[in-house]
């Protein structure tokens, strides 16, 4: 455990010195600042106002930006260490493969989760100072969604980094996966299935297997428990499960998916030629 924590600390320290972390923090901190400057909390759209509307807009933007940030900054974790021989150097010490691998994941999780979480905390604190009503249920749900989103894409990134030896190839695969989850499943695949008159329930089930789609739906579930803004899609979701069950599912499913990918990545990592 001591070695694992040491690897996590070293990865965290390295990330904090990297330019990408500064940009990453500024993006999400800047989003919150921009929303306040633009007067988002002072306006009302579709019944959403105050901090509730700000958090809704923040999570909707984060759903798009956070996955690609996690993927492109993490897929080079192992492949990059292999390229510059850091991996070979680290394993020359009495450190096991599992300690190295899970230490890297732990350190990177803290690095990518902390800025998005602290940006939300800053919004809540600023709102409290201004005397705004704090939507605690929405805040806690979004913290859970951010945790699940970080876990799922971190697992995917480490699986890619374990399989691919080249950092450039890893970046290309990461970008393709992001585009695939963001657009292809929603637009191309579903359009083809609708043209072939596939059952609507099957189409929606495939769409909800996409973690990014899960986050989109869960993000509005507290504002709109009946999911009326989604139209007929809401009937399939709410017929299959209650709103509370769906919220729990939207957090547990991506988290377990990320853990599964991380375990698969570890199995690949320990069986491959490390150098």
Residue ranges and their predicted role:
Residues 38, 42-45, 183-259, 263-266:
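Terminal transmembrane helical anchor/hairpin motif
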Residues 67-74, 122, 155-156, 185, ...:
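Hydrophobic/aromatic residues in alpha-helical transmembrane segments
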Residues 1-25:
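Aromatic- and glycine-rich beta-strand/loop motifs that create alpha-glucan
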Residues 34-39, 44, 48-63, 107-168:
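Secretory targeting signals
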Residues 147-181, 185-195:
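A structural motif at transmembrane helix-loop-helix junctions in multipass membrane proteins
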Residues 10, 14, 99-112, 116:
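Start (N-cap) of specific transmembrane helices in multi-pass transporter permeases
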Residues 57-80:
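Long, hydrophobic alpha-helical segments
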Residues 77-109:
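Helix-loop-helix units of permease transmembrane domains in multi-pass membrane transporters
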């Amino acid at each position: 455990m001591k070695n694992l924590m040491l690897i996590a600390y070293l990865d965290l320290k390295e990330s904090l010195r990297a330019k990408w972390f500064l940009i990453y923090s500024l993006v999400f901190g800047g989003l919150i600042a921009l929303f306040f400057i633009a007067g988002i909390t002072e306006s009302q759209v579709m019944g959403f106002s105050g901090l509730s509307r700000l958090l809704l807009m923040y999570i909707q933007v984060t759903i798009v930006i956070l996955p690609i940030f996690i993927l492109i900054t993490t897929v080079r974790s192992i492949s990059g260490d292999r390229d510059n021989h850091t991996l070979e150097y680290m394993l020359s010490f009495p450190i096991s493969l599992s300690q190295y691998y899970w230490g890297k994941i732990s350190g990177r999780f803290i690095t990518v989760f902390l800025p998005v979480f602290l940006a939300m905390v800053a919004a809540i604190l600023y709102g409290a100072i201004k005397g705004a009503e704090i939507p605690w249920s929405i805040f806690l749900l979004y913290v859970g969604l951010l945790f699940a989103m970080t876990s799922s894409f971190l697992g995917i990134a480490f699986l890619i980094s374990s399989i691919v030896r080249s950092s450039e190839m890893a970046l290309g695969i990461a970008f393709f996966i992001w585009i695939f989850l963001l657009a292809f499943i929603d637009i191309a695949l579903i359009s083809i299935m609708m043209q072939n008159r596939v059952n609507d329930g099957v189409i929606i089930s495939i769409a909800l297997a996409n973690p990014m789609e899960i986050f989109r739906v869960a993000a509005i579930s507290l504002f709109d428990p009946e999911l009326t803004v989604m139209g007929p899609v809401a009937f399939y979701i709410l017929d299959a499960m209650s709103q509370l069950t769906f919220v729990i599912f939207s957090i547990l499913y991506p988290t377990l998916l990320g853990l599964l990918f991380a375990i698969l990545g570890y199995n690949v990592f320990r069986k491959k030629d490390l150098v």
